[in-house]
Amino acid sequence: MFLTDKIKNDLTESRINWKVALIMIPVAFLTYLFHEFGHWIVGELLGNKMLYSLNNVTTASENYLHESDNLFVAIGGPAFTILQAIIFLIVIEKTKSIYVYPVVFFAGFVRFFSIIFGGFNKQDEAYISAMLNIGAYTFAAIVLLILLAIVWRSSAILKLNLKAVGYFTVLSVISILIVIATDKLISR
């Protein structure tokens, strides 16, 4: 058996077809936008004028109205990412649809990828831990454990094995690199 035949069989076994693979790209963009929307909406609800982009939200004045707004705005992004994963876990529980799985998987993957490869100290979770004066990795660990549990539950419902998760990881890496490249192009 050739390697290409092995991969084709693995993808079929993992229920990954072209539709599922292509869904990952818009899911990646929408996940980034939803995460940033979490920051933006919290800031706006607290009365701050916020500026929104694909991979960043900041105040128009560069200062929040209240010092505590920093913390709440920082929590908004990870909270919305967890909310996304929970909502689509519920959809998976109801529909058992493989087409929904990328939304749950990418929510977990994007926080893991950002924390590990994006420079930990630049991430929301590190900033939140510092503001709460808890261990540097505490909030990141909490967020990642919640998302891991949701991804694990979704994988179990859909009977996806570790090999399938590996293929979704590859698709997620490709998708996240497309988002990062797009952000760099539009941020010039």
Regions found by a protein language model. Name each.
Residues 21-71:
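Small-residue-rich helix-interface/hinge motifs
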Residues 1-16:
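Short, Lys/Arg-rich, polar N-terminal cytosolic tail immediately upstream
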Residues 53, 61-158, 164-183:
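Metalloprotease/metallohydrolase-associated module, dominated by Zn2+-dependent proteases
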Residues 186-188:
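Short acidic DE-rich linear segments
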Residues 13-29, 98, 167-170:
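Alpha-helical transmembrane segments and their helix-start/interface "positive-inside/aromatic belt" motifs
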